[in-house]
């Protein structure tokens, strides 16, 4: 049983956490329009000032392995964009398209699979404008494709520890290996992706009629290859909390300091070598994850290998890192740790635990509803930080296998919960903002347009995926 701290400590800790929640959900409230990152830091400072957590404990609560993995993943993603990875994904979407329905299915499948490896937010940043172009060329409505992009990115990202930030937290806290995590959620992800795709086709069958294959404009492909980064990075706000935009900038071409071997090669050969190296090293990184090597140091090593072999000033690449996201996470770690020290989360869980056991259908249903609601009220990463250990402790009383199942269930539900509303995940907001600010074929995806599809999709996809969690 969890014991509550003193009444003043509980009250002050709750106030500090309420500030964090308010700024995470409403980052631009009129009376304090400081944004999510500053709001996270403010909450962390309040926890220390109110003596809810000591300064030493506050620093100790910052999870450096997670921050290191986030940082390295952003660097690797930047090099992959410059290597044309997303250009090829764009070509795959457009190649020999048989019409609007076929294109819809491609968007769902390609986005889901790419998000599992390159994070949901990255895929949404790069693919949104290209999807708008494809729809406009074929005289198809943009809304179904934007919904497909956002929802599939969230569903696909659930499959791996590197798909989204909350999965990173779960993987590190649970010590579940990359292969075990992948195989535990992959069946649910594949079925969920298919169900989501069928729902989109059913809801927009008439609108998706037509749209025969058209040739893909080379300039569009070039824009995708460049990640739309120089313009998009300035036109799209940093969206932190349960994701990041990871805007990229093209590597500077005016740096002439090169190894003599490179100077003997043509520029075309040099670029081909660097692109090939980026792909090979990234595959090696995934293989290292699969064999169980330390995820954080594997990603950092991969990032540094790309920096060294590029043999140019790394500052343009490092500038693409969303440092505000890393600061947001640091403040969030301190805030959640302080709130846990009040004993309030533990007391609430003690009340809910008897009804949320993972060895019964009713218990799993109750637990899933709690996770789904909290993920939309408090955001999914704080929900994972608050509930993870408590859920695992309760599952440990059942069996060791139940502990793994509980972590995987938390990963699945908290991620798919992001599809419930436009505010449910950063990926949704990125798609919305990118589409609204697109220089051509802009589209304003509203809250209500999203929720009409988001609510039934989230409930059904979550439900069909839960029985498949941990079955392999």
From Swiss-Prot:
CDD domains the record matches: YbiR_permease
Entry membrane topology: Multi-pass membrane protein
Compartments, as annotated in UniProt: Cell membrane
One Pfam family hit: CitMHS
Transmembrane segments: 15-35, 38-58, 60-80, 107-127, 181-201, 272-292, 320-340, 366-386, 394-414, 450-470
Keyword Transmembrane helix: yes
Keyword Transmembrane: yes
Listed InterPro entries: Cit_transptr-like_dom
A GO term from the CC aspect: plasma membrane
Family per similarity comment: Belongs to the arsenite-antimonite (ArsB) efflux (TC 2.A.45) family.
Main function: Silicon efflux transporter involved in silicon transport from the root cells to the apoplast. Is coupled with the silicon influx transporter NIP2-1/LSI1 in both exodermal and endodermal root cells for an efficient silicon transport across the cells into the stele. Silicon is beneficial to plant growth and helps plants to overcome abiotic and biotic stresses by preventing lodging (falling over) and increasing resistance to pests and diseases, as well as other stresses.
Descriptive protein name: Silicon efflux transporter LSI2
Organism name: Oryza sativa subsp. japonica (Rice)
Lineage: Eukaryota, Viridiplantae, Streptophyta, Embryophyta, Tracheophyta
